[in-house]
C-alpha cells in the first residue's frame, strides 16, 4: 500500500479535503454536503472561535469590546448550526463523516474554554451532537476524554515570546520541513491581510472614542436590538403585563407567551362566548377552511400571504361577534410525499420502495409524516394564525379517508366515475400519471440541451425535424415536421387540410412507413394549419393530445411505442428496447441513411416537465379512472352566472367560464402507493355461464366499503353466489385533488350528519391563489354540488401570487424561497445556505441558489417579527396583481411597530398611574379643536377600515391604519397636545383641558389598537393589556375578542375641523421645508404668515399655538396682504391663501443663500418657459385632456407666483447684505 505524505502546513492539507470527502461518502449528494460543511467550518466557525478563545489563552492581545462582539458572533453561528442539527444525529447521513470531524474540531476550544452550562442549554442540539462525536472511538483515540467548560477561563497576558511569534509566525514552524516559495508568498499575503484587518479595527476603535456629537448613532440600529421575555410563564398561562415595557419594540419579547394563552382560553373556538354553536347568533356565522398545505415540508411566503389574509379576515369576523370557525388541515400530497420519502430512503439506506414492498413503504411514509408533519402547524402558530386546532384534519385521517371512500363509491355507483383508456400526462421516473398542475411548462426559444433523469448526457429540444414519407405506388413524397422525431415510430396517418389544393390528388392514398411494415393513410382534417410548414402533419394518436382527437375522428390505429419506463416497444429492431431519447438519435440517423431526412432547424416550443421528478412528461395511453365532468361543470358555471357564487376579483370569472364550458373529464387515478387506495375491485366469476371480463369492461368493476360489500354487489350483478366471486382490488390511489375536492364538508364529518356539518356548511369564504382556481376551487364546487346539493362556500377571494423583489416566481432552485420564520426571527446568510442542504436539489445545483441568496441578502435577513411580516403582506396584496415582495421592505413595518410602541409608552406616561377612562367614548363637549380633529381622523379611519374589509381591499386597510397612527396621532396630535400637559404641570388651574386630552388620547389608543388587532395580533395584545379598562369587570379578556370598531358607533367626523387642520398642516409642512432648506435644525425662527383674506388671518390666529409647536417656530405672526413681511425672510408658498416668510436675519449667512435663490429662480424660469411653450402649441387644446390642461394652468400660475416671491426674497437678502 502506498504511503501518503501529509504536509504539516494547513494550506497543503486543505487541498486533500475534497478528495477525502469524495472517497468516504456514499453518493454525490453526501460528498457535496460534506464539502459544504468543511467550508462552513473553515470560513464561519474557525475564525470566530479563534477570535474568542485566543485572547483567553494569551495567544493574542485582548480588546474587551472586540472579544465581546466575537462571542456574540460565535453564539449566532452556533445557533445556525443548532438549527441544522435539530433533525440530525450527525451532519451528513447516519454516521460520522469528515464533516463532523472538521466542524467538531472548529468548536472544540469553545466547548473547552468558553461555552458555560448556560450557553450549552441554549445550544442543546449542538451540545448533544458534540458530546456524541467526542465519545466516538475515532475521537477518543486522538483527543482522549474532553471536559466541557464549567466557567470561562480567565484572561492570560501574552509573553514577549508569544508577541514575537505573532509578529513572526514563520518561527512557529521551525521544526517542520522547509517551506516552498509559493507557501512563503501565501503567508506573506496572509500577514498583509491581518495587518489591514488590525488597522481597520484600530480605526473603528478610534471612531468610537470620538465625541458622540460628531457622529450620532442612528435610532434604527438601536431599534433592532433583541430583547427577550425572561419571566417564567407556564405554557398557557397569561403573560406578565405588570412589569414595565422594554425601552424599544422587540419581536421576541412581544410574541412570547401570548399564543399558548389564546389557545388555552379557547378564543379561537366557535364555542367561545356562547352556550353551543347551535344557538342562533344574530350577528351571523363565518366559516372558512384553510387551503391544506402539503405535508411535504415548510411553508413559504406564498403560504404566509394566504394565512395573513385569512387570519386577518377571521379575526375581523370574530371581533364583529360572529360565530367564527377557521378550520386547519394538512394535505397528504401523494406524489410530492412519495418522492420525498423515496429520495430519503435511497439517500440514507440505499433502498427503493420496491425493495421494501408496499406495506413497509407506507409505514416509512407515516413515520416521516409523524416526524416532519408538525413543522407546518408550528409555523402557522408562529404566524399568529387563530385556527381551531382541536378540529385540525389530515387528509389521510380515518374520518377523511372514510369520506373519500364514500364519495368515490357514490359517484361510481351513479356512473359518474368510470374507467377508460386515454392519453394521460405520464412521468416515466415516477411510473405514474400526474395532474396538469404538476407539469411545468419550460419555454424554449430554440435549440436547448436539457438534463433528463436516467441520461448521462443532456438531451436536445427546441428543434423541428423535417422528413419525407414516400407515397405508395409513386415516386412522390410528403414532407412532414415534428419536434419529437422518435414518435414517428407510432405514426398511423398523415393529415392535410380538406381545402389544401396541393394534396387533393392524395385522397384515398397511403404513404409507406420507412421502418415498420405498414401503410399509413392520408386523411383530411380541419385542424391542420395549411400555412404551417408544408401543410402536412404526421399523426401519432397514442402519443399526442391533438393527434388523439384526430385518431378518434378517423378511426385510426392507436400504436403505443413507449412502456411505463420510457423504453421503446411495439417496433422492429434496432429501435426495440431503446430508451426514448436514445431512439430519438437513432431514428434521425436512420432517416438520413435512407435519404428521407430533409432538415433540422431551431423551433420555439414548450417542453412539459414533471415538477416532482424533473422528467420530460410523455402523453401515454393508459387505462385510468375518470370523473365525468360535463354536467357538474355546467352547474358550477351556472352558479357563478346566476350570482350564487361570487369570484373576487371578478375578472377571474371569465377564466372560470372558459374552463367550465369546455371542461374535460378528470383523470383521478395515480400509479402510486401513498394515498387513498381506490375502493374498486376487478371481478372474476368462477361460473362457466359467465365469460371472463376484460380490464376495460366497467361491468367487471365494482366498488365497496369492504371486500364483503363489493363481493355482495358482484354476486348480485352476475346472479351467482358470493363464494363464486374472486376480487382483486385496484392498485392505484386517488389523485390528491379528489380528497381536497371534498375538503369543505369532509372536515365537518360528512357523510355523517354532525352538528358541525349542520352549522358550518356551506362555508362563507374560500381564500386562495388564482393559480389553483381550476385544480382545486372548481373541483370543490363541482363535488360539493354533486354530493351535498349545496355550494361549499358563497365567495371565492383570489389573493396575489408572491414573487421575489425581481418579479421571479419563488423556487428552491433559484434560492429565493423564504421561510416565513426567517423574516420572523431573522437568519444569517450561512443559515440560508444550510437550508439548501435539506432540499432535494442536486448537489451540482446548489451553487446557483447560493449566489442568489448572497446577492439578495449579503449579510442576513433581519429580524422583523410576525406582525411586521403580516402587515407587509396585507399592504402589498392587491386584487388581480402579483406581489414583488422585497424582504427588506418588511423591515420598514418593523420600524412602524417601534413607532407604535414608543407612542403608547409616551401616552401611558402622560395618562399616569391614576388615570381612569370614562365609561363611554367622548362626545363633543369640552374637547379642544385638536381633540375634535384627532377624533374625526379616528372616525374616518374606522369607516375606511370597515368599508375596505367588506370589499377585501387590504391595502386600503393598512393605509388607513398606518396613516392614522403615524401621520395623524404621532406626528400631529401627540406633538400638538404636549404644551397642554406641560401647562397643566406648571399651573394647576389648567388641569381640566389636560384631563379632557387624556380621555381623547386614551380613546385613540384603545380604538386604534382594536383597528390594528386583526393585522398585528401580538403587538396589539401586548399594548392593549397595559391599558386601563373602561369597564374592568365586563370588558373582554383579550383584544382578539373585543368588538371591532364600528362606523356607526364612532361617528365623529367633522369636515370643518378636518379642512382647517389640513390647511394648518400645509403651513407647518412649508415651514418645516424651509427650516430644512436653510439647515435650521435646532434654531427656532419667527414666521410671518401673509394671508390673502381676513378669514385666513383668523384661522392662523386660532391655530397659532399648534403651528408654532408643530413647526418648532419662535413665534407665528399673521399678516393681512398687502402688508409686507420684514426684510430678511425666506419665502415659500403654503397655499393660494397663505405665504410663509421665515425670518433668517441673524440666523444664517446671507451671502451663501443668495446664490441658492438665484439657482431656484433659474429653475422656475425654465419651468415656466417649458409650460408656456407646451400650452401655446396649436393642437394643445384638442389633444390634451381637459383635466391635464387645468393642471398645467395651475402649475404655471403657482410657478409664476413662486418666482415673484423668490425675486422678493432675493431683494430682501440684497438689502440685508
UniProtKB/Swiss-Prot annotation:
- Residues bound to ATP: 812
Q: Which GO terms describe its molecular function?
A: aminoacyl-tRNA deacylase activity; ATP binding; valine-tRNA ligase activity
Question: Keyword annotations for this protein?
Answer: Aminoacyl-tRNA synthetase, ATP-binding, Ligase, Nucleotide-binding, Protein biosynthesis
State whether keyword ATP-binding applies: yes
- Documented EC number(s): 6.1.1.9
Known catalysed reaction(s)?
tRNA(Val) + L-valine + ATP = L-valyl-tRNA(Val) + AMP + diphosphate
Task: Please tell me which stretches of this chain the record labels as motif 'KMSKS' region.
Answer: 809-813
Q: Which GO terms describe its biological process?
A: valyl-tRNA aminoacylation
Residue ranges occupied by any GST C-terminal domain in the UniProt entry: 27-155
GO CC terms, sorted: cytosol
Superkingdom of origin: Eukaryota
Q: List the CDD domains.
A: Anticodon_Ia_Val (cd07962), GST_C_ValRS_N (cd10294), ValRS_core (cd00817)
Q: Does the keyword Endoplasmic reticulum apply?
A: no
Q: Where is this motif: 'HIGH' region?
A: 293-303
Q: Which PANTHER family match?
A: VALINE--TRNA LIGASE, VALYL-TRNA SYNTHETASES
**Family named by the database record:** Belongs to the class-I aminoacyl-tRNA synthetase family.
In Swiss-Prot or TrEMBL terms, this protein is called Valine--tRNA ligase
Which organism is this protein's natural source? Takifugu rubripes (Japanese pufferfish)
Amino acid at each position: 500500500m502506498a504511503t501518503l505524505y501529509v504536509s504539516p502546513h494547513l494550506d497543503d492539507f486543505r487541498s486533500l479535503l475534497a478528495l477525502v470527502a469524495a472517497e468516504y461518502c456514499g453518493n454525490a449528494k453526501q460528498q457535496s454536503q460534506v464539502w459544504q460543511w468543511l467550508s462552513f467550518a473553515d470560513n464561519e466557525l474557525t475564525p470566530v472561535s479563534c477570535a474568542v478563545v485566543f485572547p483567553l489563552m494569551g495567544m493574542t492581545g485582548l480588546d474587551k469590546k472586540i472579544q465581546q462582539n466575537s462571542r456574540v458572533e460565535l453564539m449566532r453561528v452556533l445557533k445556525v448550526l443548532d438549527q441544522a442539527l435539530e433533525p440530525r444525529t450527525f451532519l451528513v447521513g447516519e454516521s460520522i463523516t469528515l464533516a463532523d470531524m472538521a466542524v467538531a474540531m472548529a468548536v472544540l476550544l469553545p466547548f473547552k474554554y468558553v461555552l458555560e452550562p448556560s450557553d450549552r442549554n441554549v445550544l442543546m442540539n449542538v451540545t448533544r451532537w458534540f458530546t456524541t462525536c467526542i465519545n466516538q472511538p475515532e475521537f477518543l483515540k486522538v483527543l482522549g476524554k474532553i471536559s466541557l467548560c464549567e466557567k470561562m477561563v480567565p484572561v492570560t497576558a501574552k509573553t514577549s515570546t508569544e508577541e514575537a511569534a505573532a509578529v513572526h509566525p514563520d518561527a512557529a514552524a521551525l521544526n517542520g520541513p522547509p517551506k516552498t516559495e509559493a507557501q512563503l508568498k501565501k503567508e506573506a499575503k496572509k500577514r498583509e491581510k491581518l495587518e489591514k484587518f488590525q488597522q481597520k479595527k484600530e480605526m473603528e476603535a478610534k471612531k468610537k472614542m470620538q465625541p458622540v456629537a460628531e457622529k450620532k448613532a442612528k435610532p434604527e440600529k438601536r431599534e433592532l436590538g433583541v430583547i427577550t421575555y425572561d419571566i417564567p410563564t407556564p405554557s398557557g398561562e397569561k403573560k406578565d403585563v405588570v412589569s414595565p415595557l422594554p425601552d424599544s419594540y422587540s419581536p421576541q419579547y412581544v410574541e412570547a407567551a401570548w399564543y399558548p394563552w389564546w389557545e388555552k382560553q379557547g378564543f379561537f373556538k366557535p364555542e367561545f362566548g356562547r352556550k353551543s354553536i347551535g344557538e342562533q347568533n344574530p350577528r351571523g356565522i363565518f366559516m372558512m377552511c384553510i387551503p391544506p398545505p402539503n405535508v411535504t415540508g415548510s411553508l413559504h411566503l406564498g403560504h404566509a400571504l394566504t394565512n395573513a389574509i385569512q387570519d386577518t379576515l377571521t379575526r375581523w369576523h370574530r371581533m364583529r361577534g360572529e360565530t367564527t370557525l377557521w378550520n386547519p388541515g394538512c394535505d397528504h400530497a401523494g406524489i410530492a410525499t412519495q418522492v420525498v420519502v423515496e429520495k430519503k430512503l435511497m439517500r440514507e439506506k440505499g433502498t427503493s420502495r420496491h425493495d421494501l414492498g408496499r406495506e413497509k413503504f407506507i409505514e416509512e411514509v407515516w413515520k416521516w409524516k409523524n416526524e416532519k408533519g408538525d413543522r407546518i402547524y408550528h409555523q402557522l402558530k408562529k404566524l399568529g394564525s387563530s385556527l381551531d386546532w382541536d378540529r385540525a384534519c389530515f387528509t389521510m385521517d380515518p374520518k377523511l379517508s372514510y369520506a373519500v371512500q364514500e364519495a368515490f363509491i357514490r359517484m361510481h355507483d351513479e356512473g359518474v366515475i368510470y374507467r377508460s383508456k386515454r392519453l394521460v400526462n405520464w412521468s416515466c421516473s415516477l411510473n405514474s400519471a400526474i395532474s396538469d398542475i404538476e407539469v411545468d411548462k419550460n419555454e424554449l426559444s430554440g435549440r436547448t440541451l436539457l438534463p433528463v433523469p436516467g441520461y448521462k448526457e443532456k438531451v436536445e429540444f427546441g428543434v423541428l425535424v423535417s422528413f419525407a414519407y414516400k407515397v405508395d405506388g409513386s415516386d412522390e413524397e410528403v414532407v412532414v415536421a415534428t419536434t419529437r422525431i422518435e414518435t414517428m415510430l407510432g405514426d398511423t396517418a398523415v393529415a392535410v387540410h380538406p381545402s389544401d389544393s396541393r394534396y387533393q390528388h392524395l385522397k384515398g392514398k397511403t404513404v409507406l412507413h420507412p421502418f415498420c411494415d405498414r401503410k399509413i393513410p392520408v386523411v383530411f382534417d380541419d385542424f391542420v394549419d395549411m400555412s404551417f410548414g408544408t401543410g402536412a402533419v404526421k399523426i401519432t394518436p397514442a402519443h399526442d393530445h391533438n393527434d388523439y382527437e384526430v385518431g378518434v375522428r378517423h378511426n385510426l390505429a392507436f400504436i403505443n411505442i413507449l412502456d411505463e419506463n420510457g423504453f421503446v416497444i411495439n417496433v422492429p429492431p434496432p429501435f426495440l428496447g431503446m430508451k426514448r431519447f436514445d431512439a430519438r438519435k437513432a431514428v434521425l440517423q436512420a432517416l438520413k441513411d435512407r435519404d428521407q431526412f430533409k432538415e433540422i432547424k431551431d423551433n420555439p416550443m414548450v417542453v412539459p416537465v414533471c415538477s416532482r421528478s424533473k422528467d420530460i412528461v410523455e402523453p401515454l395511453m393508459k387505462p385510468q379512472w375518470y370523473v365525468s365532468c360535463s354536467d357538474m361543470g355546467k352547474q358550477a358555471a351556472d352558479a357563478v352566472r346566476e350570482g350564487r357564487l361570487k369570484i373576487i376579483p371578478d375578472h377571474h370569472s371569465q377564466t372560470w367560464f372558459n374552463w367550465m364550458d369546455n371542461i374535460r373529464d378528470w383523470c383521478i387515478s395515480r400509479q402510486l402507493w401513498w394515498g387513498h387506495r381506490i375502493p374498486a375491485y376487478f371481478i372474476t366469476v368462477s361460473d362457466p355461464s359467465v365469460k371472463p371480463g376484460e380490464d376495460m369492461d366497467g361491468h367487471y368493476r365494482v366498488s365497496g366499503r369492504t371486500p364483503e360489500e363489493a363481493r355482495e354487489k358482484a354476486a348480485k350483478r352476475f346472479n351467482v353466489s358470493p363464494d363464486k366471486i374472486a376480487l382483486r382490488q385496484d392498485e392505484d390511489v386517488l389523485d390528491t385533488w379528489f380528497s381536497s375536492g371534498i375538503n369543505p364538508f369532509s372536515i365537518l364529518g360528512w357523510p355523517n350528519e354532525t352538528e358541525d356539518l349542520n352549522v358550518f356548511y356551506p362555508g362563507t369564504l374560500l381564500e386562495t391563489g388564482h393559480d389553483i382556481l381550476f385544480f382545486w376551487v372548481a373541483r370543490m364546487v363541482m363535488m360539493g354540488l354533486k354530493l351535498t346539493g349545496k355550494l361549499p362556500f358563497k365567495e371565492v377571494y383570489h389573493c396575489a401570487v408572491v414573487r421575489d423583489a425581481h418579479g421571479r416566481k419563488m423556487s428552491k432552485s433559484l434560492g429565493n424561497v423564504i421561510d416565513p420564520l426567517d423574516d420572523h426571527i431573522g437568519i444569517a446568510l450561512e443559515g440560508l445556505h444550510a437550508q439548501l442542504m435539506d432540499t432535494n436539489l442536486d448537489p451540482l445545483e446548489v451553487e446557483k441558489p447560493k449566489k442568489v441568496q448572497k446577492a439578495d441578502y449579503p449579510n442576513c435577513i433581519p429580524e422583523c417579527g410576525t406582525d411586521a411580516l403580516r402587515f407587509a403582506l396585507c399592504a402589498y396584496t392587491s386584487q388581480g396583481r402579483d406581489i414583488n415582495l422585497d424582504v427588506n421592505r418588511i423591515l420598514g413595518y418593523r420600524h412602524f411597530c417601534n413607532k407604535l410602541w414608543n407612542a403608547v409608552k409616551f401616552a401611558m406616561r402622560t395618562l399616569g398611574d391614576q388615570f381612569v377612562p370614562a365609561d363611554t367614548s367622548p362626545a363633543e363637549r369640552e374637547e379642544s379643536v385638536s381633540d375634535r380633529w384627532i377624533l374625526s381622523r379616528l372616525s374616518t379611519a374606522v369607516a375606511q377600515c370597515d368599508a375596505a374589509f367588506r370589499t377585501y381591499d387590504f391595502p386600503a386597510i393598512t393605509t388607513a391604519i398606518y396613516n392614522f397612527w403615524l401621520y395623524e396621532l404621532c406626528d400631529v396630535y401627540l406633538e400638538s397636545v404636549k404644551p397642554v400637559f406641560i401647562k397643566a404641570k406648571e399651573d394647576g388651574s389648567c388641569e381640566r383641558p389636560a384631563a379632557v386630552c387624556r380621555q381623547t388620547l386614551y380613546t385613540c389608543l384603545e380604538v386604534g389598537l382594536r383597528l390594528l388587532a386583526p393585522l398585528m395580533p401580538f403587538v396589539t395584545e401586548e399594548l392593549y393589556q397595559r391599558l386601563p379598562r373602561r369597564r374592568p369587570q365586563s370588558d373582554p379578556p383579550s383584544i382578539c375578542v373585543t368588538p371591532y370598531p364600528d362606523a356607526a358607533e364612532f361617528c365623529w367626523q367633522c369636515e370643518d375641523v378636518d379642512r382647517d387642520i389640513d390647511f394648518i398642516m400645509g403651513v407647518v409642512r412649508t415651514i418645516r421645508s424651509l427650516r430644512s432648506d436653510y439647515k435650521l435644525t435646532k434654531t427656532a425662527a419667527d414666521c410671518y404668515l401673509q394671508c390673502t383674506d381676513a378669514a385666513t388671518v383668523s384661522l392662523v390666529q386660532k391655530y397659532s399655538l399648534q403651528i408654532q409647536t408643530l413647526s418648532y417656530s419662535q413665534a407665528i405672526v399673521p399678516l393681512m396682504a398687502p402688508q409686507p413681511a420684514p426684510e430678511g425672510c425666506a419665502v415659500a408658498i403654503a397655499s393660494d391663501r397663505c405665504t410663509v416668510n421665515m425670518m433668517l436675519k441673524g440666523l444664517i449667512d446671507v451671502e451663501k443663500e443668495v446664490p441658492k435663490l438665484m439657482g431656484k429662480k433659474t429653475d422656475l424660469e425654465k419651468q415656466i418657459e417649458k409650460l408656456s411653450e407646451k400650452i401655446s402649441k396649436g393642437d394643445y387644446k384638442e389633444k390634451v385632456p381637459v383635466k391635464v390642461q387645468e393642471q398645467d394652468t395651475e402649475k404655471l400660475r403657482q410657478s409664476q407666483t413662486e418666482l415673484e416671491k423668490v425675486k422678493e426674497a432675493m431683494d430682501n437678502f440684497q438689502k440685508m447684505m
